[in-house]
């Protein structure tokens, strides 16, 4: 994307970015896991961290509308809350599309959108935040306190988007039971629009093994095939880049030879 301040074309935080100059709209994709640091998101191009989103938003004018697409199995809860707040503060109109899945913290991020569309067959999942910890009893008490605070923050987000009559206790119960929603069930509890289109291909996530009630349709995903396809695509990109660089060098060599010939050398 061309940076409107510097005029340079830049890689915007490893994000897939499309821009419609006439309508002043951009597209942002969450098609991988939510991670805490840039070095983690560099391992897999589809993963996202808060700094990626900051880089993305910093290159917009602050009023451009954003279409945000979701097919994510979730990830780091603090990174996800940071991304939610970044997007929530952004002044442009944000339209969210759950194409395949918005699980765990990804289901929080999607509610940063001003309007939300749910594809027929798409899935969402809400649950209590979880973590790994070690230490003494005091350390674990501190972790429990932090998890409860996170749960309250997540509940606050969900409650801003529930249907009339849905109580906080009900959403908290659904979180405790790790509840998966199809598009129809999602609309029973939350203010979302259902789109008459099929969900996209299955999402590969490192966080599936941490969930308890994964729908049968998701259990059969062969993530190895997906990883192999991603690796093959990256290799193709690297080969294409290497070939382009080779052609550039050859062109420069030819230009030098032509200049030497022009001056009789």
Spans of features found by a protein language model:
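N-terminal organellar transit peptides
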Residues: 1-105, 113-265
């Amino acid at each position: 994307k061309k940076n409107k301040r510097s005029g340079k074309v830049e890689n915007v935080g490893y994000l897939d970015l499309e821009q419609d100059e006439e309508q002043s709209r951009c597209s942002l994709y969450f098609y991988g896991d939510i991670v805490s640091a840039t070095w983690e998101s560099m391992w897999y191009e589809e993963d996202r961290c808060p700094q990626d989103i900051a880089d993305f938003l910093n290159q917009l004018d602050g009023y451009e509308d954003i279409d945000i697409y979701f097919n994510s199995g979730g990830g780091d809860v603090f990174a996800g809350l940071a991304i939610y707040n970044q997007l929530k503060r952004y002044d442009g109109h944000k339209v969210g599309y759950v194409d395949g899945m918005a699980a765990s913290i990804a289901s929080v991020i999607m509610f940063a959108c001003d309007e939300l569309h749910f594809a027929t067959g798409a899935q969402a999942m809400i649950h209590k935040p979880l973590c790994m910890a070690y230490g003494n009893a005091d350390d674990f008490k501190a972790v429990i306190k932090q998890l409860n605070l996170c749960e309250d923050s997540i509940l606050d987000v969900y409650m801003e988007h529930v249907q009339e009559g849905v109580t906080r206790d009900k959403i908290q119960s659904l979180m405790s039971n790790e509840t998966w929603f199809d598009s129809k069930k999602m609309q029973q509890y939350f203010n979302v629009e259902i789109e008459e289109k099929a969900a996209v291909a299955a999402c590969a996530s490192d966080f599936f093994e941490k969930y308890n009630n994964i729908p049968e349709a998701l259990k059969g995903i062969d993530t190895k095939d997906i990883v192999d396809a991603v690796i093959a695509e990256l290799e193709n990109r690297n080969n294409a880049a290497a070939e382009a660089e080779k052609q550039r060098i050859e062109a420069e060599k030819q230009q030098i030879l032509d200049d030497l010939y022009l001056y009789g050398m």
